Amino acid sequence: MRFSVLLTGLAAAGSIATAERTCGAVPPRAYEKEFTEALNSLSPEAASADLTAGITIDTYLHVLTSGQTGNIPDSQLQAQINAMNQHYSQAGVQFKLVKATRTDNANWASGRDEAGMKKALHMGTYSSLNIYFIPNLSSGLLGICYFPRANPSQTTIIMDGCMVRSGTVPGGETTNYNQGKTATHEVGHFLGLYHVFSENGSCVDADMVADTPAQSKKTSGCPSSQDSCPGGGVDSIHNYMDYSYDVCMNQFTPGQANRIAQSWRAFRAGH
């Protein structure tokens, strides 16, 4: 999933003036069919066991720099892990930092040669999370992450994980998006979550989760309230899978936690 910022005015290198996030990609066409088939192969007890016991994910953080541009100190990397652990505690997920790497490569730090970068840096298995912090993702993107797939090839495993704009870590320079919640949002896709809003402006169950009301549009900024589909409940403006400012985001629902557990068991656990 691609997560981007529409720019207002000129942005200095390493500093972004932001208006709103926009998304430039959708889940794989066959994803929901794969998800349903994988779930049907599980016993209900298998997924519920993950909810009860919790999920711990081995996590590798990769910092890409061009000279000093994009460097993230260890303290901010730990702050990012701490933030994700806090955000996902309500969903029964925790992240264990196994290793952090730093690579000075101007090409990779500009978001180019994704395949070459991941082939060189990817660590762990399909159940491991790799996050690549990149200072200059193309077209103002804040993040890109891949949904889990059934029977992943070796190429799919290597290309897995998330690319996140460096300035979105806690204390970063990306205005309105510097509390570490871009990584939280992107990791939601890694764990099988869709956006809470419809991608085509309709009032449908866009995210396949019963306790997130239908929402026909993404949230911009941090409104006091928003109800784009009257009658079904107000929009999930505080949900990590919307597009609100970081300060507005503070919630996963029980239904999302259940989908994460199901997705984990179906696609990633033991792989």
UniProtKB/Swiss-Prot annotation:
Subcellular localization, as worded in the UniProt entry: Secreted
Keyword Glycoprotein: yes
An example Gene Ontology CC term for this record: extracellular region
Top-level EC class: hydrolase
BP terms from Gene Ontology: proteolysis
UniProt signal peptide: 1-19
An annotated Gene Ontology molecular function: metal ion binding
InterPro entries: MetalloPept_cat_dom_sf, Peptidase_M43
Superkingdom per UniProt: Eukaryota
Glycosylation site positions: N136, N200
Residue positions of the active site: E186
Residues that, per the record, bind Zn(2+): H185, H189
Main location, first listed in the record: secreted
Entry similarity comment: Belongs to the peptidase M43B family.
PANTHER family per UniProt: METALLOPROTEASE MEP1 (AFU_ORTHOLOGUE AFUA_1G07730)-RELATED, PTHR47466
Record's protein name: Extracellular metalloprotease ARB_05317
Organism annotation: Arthroderma benhamiae (strain ATCC MYA-4681 / CBS 112371) (Trichophyton mentagrophytes)
